């Protein structure tokens, strides 16, 4: 029987919307798990990404961005999910953007000050800072805000200093047995990952035209005799006008979304995928907590 020590722990990635938390998670894992888009609020579930390297297993919790606006049911639930994942972790990675500091950053910081877990401050997108002379004073300002475990300037996009973050994480993992098998990347089901891939393509190809009132339900996910998967996805929007937008002229938009989503699914599932998409109007779902529960938005709260 092996007596080699193993280390395992949970790490929360927190920050206001759109600072690059999902991109950082994907870089730390070495592959795409969390949906990334230039649009704020694209992460709606607490996706757990698992990175196992030798005796070390880091389990990452990718929170929705904590934000001030709490009017709609979906925003309240997203804030609750983010706040709850700050508790029960060994370490927190607080992601901020370049030299920007907003009331939302302040709100996240206040939540972290109340917590017990040590906090790494990841200052993302430093490669995009135009006035490099502003960077050092800003880092000094950040250092004065709380007793951070470390402050690391990074670029999640290019991977700059992401290995530094991973190294700090490894040092702070407690001695424990691994929670997941070595080849696990995420504890989310393939069905969930399929819906996230479709939602990312919607964000990518519709951009600012489409509000957050869009979600994806996987109605069918079965293996077929060809050794692949037959997947049916239902795209839910709030208004008829949004439905037309998703379908596009003569179905061109939904066809592109389907083709691109299928490519990503085949890469992720390592099998052929037959994907069919439909669009349906379900008015007011983002305001209805029961509808959100039925779509799996609160399965982990």
Swiss-Prot record:
Residues 15-22 are annotated as: G1. Residues 7-175 form the Era-type G domain. One of its GO terms (biological process) is ribosomal small subunit assembly. Residues 62-65 are annotated as: G3. Residues 124-127 are annotated as: G4. Pfam families: KH_2 (PF07650), MMR_HSR1 (PF01926). Keywords: Cell inner membrane, Cell membrane, Cytoplasm, GTP-binding, Membrane, Nucleotide-binding, Ribosome biogenesis, RNA-binding, rRNA-binding. InterPro entries: G_ERA_dom, GTP-bd, GTPase_Era-like, KH_dom-like_a/b, KH_dom_type_2, KH_sf_prok-type, P-loop_NTPase, Small_GTP-bd. It comes from the Bacteria. Residues 206-283 form the KH type-2 domain. Monomer. Belongs to the TRAFAC class TrmE-Era-EngA-EngB-Septin-like GTPase superfamily. Era GTPase family. This is GTPase Era. It comes from Salmonella typhimurium (strain LT2 / SGSC1412 / ATCC 700720). The lineage of its organism: Bacteria, Pseudomonadati, Pseudomonadota, Gammaproteobacteria, Enterobacterales. The gene is era.
